Amino acid sequence: MNVEHEIKLLIDEIKRLGVENSENKTWTVKYGVLFSDDKCANIFEALVGTLRAAKKRKIVKFDGEILLQGVHDQVDIVLLKDTL
């Protein structure tokens, strides 16, 4: 799977699992929700790598450079735009 395709899938999963903020048209999901979701586990070989690639392209934002299960479960992943 290529990076762009995985980012598109990530966008879909953030919308499926997250909450929309109608004020600024963003979606937010907790890292722990994404990480522990069975569908996401089956889609993404390296969720953190996909998140970092999306962050580099300014599609998502989150605090920190790398996210770890358990330690960062409550970190918000914010979808800034839903297109590449």
Segment roles from a protein language model:
Residues 17-25, 50-51, 65-68:
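Beta-strand elements of modular eukaryotic interaction domains
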Residues 21-37:
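Short acidic, hydrophobic short linear motifs in intrinsically disordered regions
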Residues 66-84:
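Short, cationic-aromatic polyanion-contact patches
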Residues 2-9, 29-33, 42, 46-50:
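Acidic, Ser/Thr-rich intrinsically disordered and amphipathic helical segments
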Residues 35-67:
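Charge-enriched amphipathic alpha-helical scaffolds
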Residues 1-7, 53, 60-65, 76:
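Eukaryotic low-complexity, proline/serine- and acidic-rich intrinsically disordered regions
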Residues 10, 14, 29-31, 54, ...:
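Generic structural hydrophobic/aromatic packing signal, biased to beta-strands
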Residues 1-22:
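Short alpha-helical segments that sit at the start of domains
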